[in-house]
């Protein structure tokens, strides 16, 4: 009795460990709506794999963050294009001066309260800057394209994670059905043993062994149910649904074909890698970032070139102390006396003559306070300026920027190479895992077929009193364990094959 329970519990623990370890693909952490909108409610009806993927793509926070990052890069690109345009700024001030102050228009000291305004418009256009503006646009454009590929990568990762969680849930459901059938078989066996015990055909220990086996099978159902609940919760959280939706969450369970136990799974790894490298967004994003880093080198080298800018401004102003001359009429002509020197005495004093000269007519003016718009129009000043800056010595900033840009290119090139290497290794690992799962399925299938016959023979011998309960339970538990291995190997192969199909550009479907 003790031996049976120990072996049964050991196999149950091993089965649970295998169940937990199946489909050990990286799963995204549950997305929560902390500080944001509440999680979306789950729709009614069973979920299909495609429906789950579509819903996750629409509600996943990582995908949203990738989209926002791309929008930010697009805004940066737009701004860099606008940098080619001239700048234009308007300025205006209003000032009150009290006491003895300089009149801002006459530049004379005056002891009065003066209100003044200054208005200006400045514009600047960069004519040449070592092609830095254009290289900035090209670099930002590449960064934006890479961020779009990041969105696709986030969507692909999420789709694979949803497919993994979906298959994990289907696996748990099938294990529950398998264990429930064992419970039904054990219940029938207990009933038969009770009849045989009353007839005196078997000992009471056989009934106790049958009841022990029934309890063990029921425990396996509970374990499988708990695993199913965990798998369902993982999928619900991955979809960013509220945790309370797990109680009513159901998935569509299609009839999945068993792996071919005869023909080995074959795949052209080189062709699969080339297809994946040409289609997967993470590879393209890495290549775009290498190109962006190269543009960064050109951008940094542009700091060696002179900078030529065109600057223009228009200024004007108003002062409350400003005045304007107003014509009040013509004055009488001025009479100018005429003096004459004595030619015999050149050094003598000139004498007044009887002649006179009429001078020019002088206009009479008076000064009145000047109006605001009159002063604004009269005080306009204009400036046009070319500015040339030639870098000579700036603390090795340009040289350092170039060195950093070169290093950044090397870093991004290594990342691109690492991305391709990781992709190749992932394909090779998925292929090896798929082959191993197929072989495990074939072995488990043969084992189930053999143990099914062995368990039937053991059941006949047990019912006839020719086999004790311990040996019968061992035979039954061996079959249960083999059936669990077969189911897990089946779903492991299906997932690995779907991953490889995905690398070949095929959609995720069951």
Predicted regions, residues:
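Acidic, low-complexity, intrinsically disordered peripheral segments
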Residues: 2-17, 29-42, 98, 243, ...
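Periplasmic alpha-helical coiled-coil/stalk elements that build and connect Gram-negative outer-membrane
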Residues: 2-7, 157-275, 433, 437, ...
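Bacterial Sec-pathway N-terminal export signals of envelope proteins
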Residues: 30-93, 99, 252-298, 391-392, ...
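Sec/SRP-type N-terminal targeting helices
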Residues: 64-68, 81, 113, 127-155, ...
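Short segments within alpha-helical structural elements
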Residues: 82, 219-241, 437, 441, ...
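Membrane-embedded beta-strand positions in outer-membrane beta-barrel channels/transporters
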Residues: 120-122, 166, 273, 385-387, ...
